[in-house]
Amino acid sequence: MSTAAPQENSPELKLSPSSKLNGFEWWRRTLSYQTGLGLNAEEKAQYEFDYNNRNLAEKCQQCNEYRNWMLEYSPSVLFMMDHIKKLTKDKEPILTKENITCDVCDFTKGGGFHPDEGILLCANWIRNKWQLEDILTHELVHVYDYLKFNLDMNNLRHHACTEIRASMLSGECRIWQEIKKTGLGNFGKKFQDCIKRRAVLSVSSNPICKSPEEAEKVVSTVWNSCFNDTRPFERVYR
């Protein structure tokens, strides 16, 4: 169970020289990336690769600080942690700060959850505190579903349902974020389209899924029941 990062990087890319990773030149590249001005596809891919592979120790430290802040102050994270604690009852807690781990990832994911290992937050894919909040909330929904519904990731319907719920409840598909990515067109369906897109992408990566077409079919099959299930929240509020 994992949260997809924005883009895949070419395996042929290598880290740029240090002169391009610091100071004015890095500021200039960042501005070009953010505005899209004077940036071709190759330069965009190189910037993303450099961003995700520079200052890794610093990014892990920052990720830990963000995680600690969220575990102390984030309404959505605290709410999910409380409901997960209720499901574990008197058993050994499934989650603590010690097994919500920040690390460098060599795959294009923002995070992941494994029942035996806890939650992984990919420090080199996390750009700011609020993205970490979305990713952590997403993974906490997976933890909740695992405890509440006996989630089986070898069942594609289970996988599709928890991905629909996690993208819906985490805030990753906020309307304003989708407008920034895709413009104002098809405004009324942006939220649903984002959730479906992310769910299909995740299910497609499941080893037992045969094709993207199968992933789309499974997501469509469970859509109505899972999209309308906001537990443990009363409604979608992020």
Curated annotation (Swiss-Prot):
Pfam families: Peptidase_M76. The active site is at 139. InterPro entries: Peptidase_M76_ATP23 (IPR019165). The gene is ATP23. It is a peripheral membrane protein. Keywords: Hydrolase, Membrane, Metal-binding, Metalloprotease, Mitochondrion, Mitochondrion inner membrane, Protease. It comes from the Eukaryota. The keyword Hydrolase applies. Its EC number is 3.4.24.-. It is an enzyme of class 3 (hydrolase). GO terms for cellular component: mitochondrial inner membrane. Coiled coil: none annotated. Belongs to the peptidase M76 family. It is found in: Mitochondrion inner membrane. Its main location: mitochondrion. This is Mitochondrial inner membrane protease ATP23. GO terms for biological process: mitochondrial protein processing; mitochondrial proton-transporting ATP synthase complex assembly.
